[in-house]
A protein has these predicted regions:
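Hydrophobic alpha-helical segments
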Residues: 10, 186-197
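Rossmann-fold dinucleotide-binding core
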Residues: 1-73
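Helical "substrate-binding/catalytic lid" subdomain
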Residues: 44, 63-185
């Protein structure tokens, strides 16, 4: 808010416009864009933002950044749930590809599910969205929650899993690699590496 006020005092405007959607949506120009600040300024820059995706005005200064924290808290919980679910499936001995096909049209399905589950099944942890970047956002959410004097128990679990990834040298891998935490805890290997024929 301090930077916002400095810009305003200097006769300028400042908008916070974090994005979500990862590399594929950035390339396609379909990012979710969360913009906070003066509404009039948002209206002026909306056509520029629209070149990159779908801008939504979230309210006053810093509201875009807080909205992004909400997005990443929820996204982190979904990612950890996917990792846990697929480790559970592997331990139970059911086919992961069949599980994916059977569940992707249900409540569990969605863009993140469609993006990450095939990576888990193939054990492809090439970074598209690095755990390190997401962990930074989770730490920011925890910091803000502390300022608000609130508990975030599910986000605590997400941070615990991401901290384990950091401590075990997997922090720069794709978010799909979160399954490695559950492989360690459940004593199971999830997915298969594809080999060239």
């Amino acid at each position: 808010l301090e930077l916002y006020q400095q810009a305003k005092d200097a006769g300028m405007f400042l908008l916070d416009s974090p994005v979500s959607g990862g590399n594929p949506m950035a390339i396609a120009g379909t990012l979710a864009i969360m913009t906070g600040g003066d509404k009039e300024a948002f209206v002026k820059v909306k056509p520029v933002l629209a070149c990159m995706g779908s801008p939504v005005y979230t309210g006053g200064p810093a509201s875009g950044s807080v909205t992004k924290l909400v997005n990443n808290m929820i996204g982190g919980a979904i990612l950890v749930a996917i990792a846990e679910g697929y480790a559970f499936a592997a331990k139970a001995g059911i086919d992961l590809q069949t599980t994916f096909e059977a569940t992707r049209g249900g409540f569990a399905g969605g863009p993140m599910y469609d993006n990450k589950v095939p990576k888990i099944i193939k054990r492809d942890y090439t970074p598209g969205a690095r755990i390190a970047v997401h962990r930074k956002d989770i730490l920011n959410a925890k910091h803000y929650a502390h300022k608000l004097d609130i508990d975030t128990p599910l986000t605590d679990v997400v941070l615990h899993v991401m901290d384990w990834m950091n401590d075990n040298g997997h922090i720069d891998e794709d978010q799909a690699a979160l399954v490695k935490y559950y492989e360690d805890k459940m004593g199971v290997k999830v997915g298969r590496e594809e080999t060239a024929d």
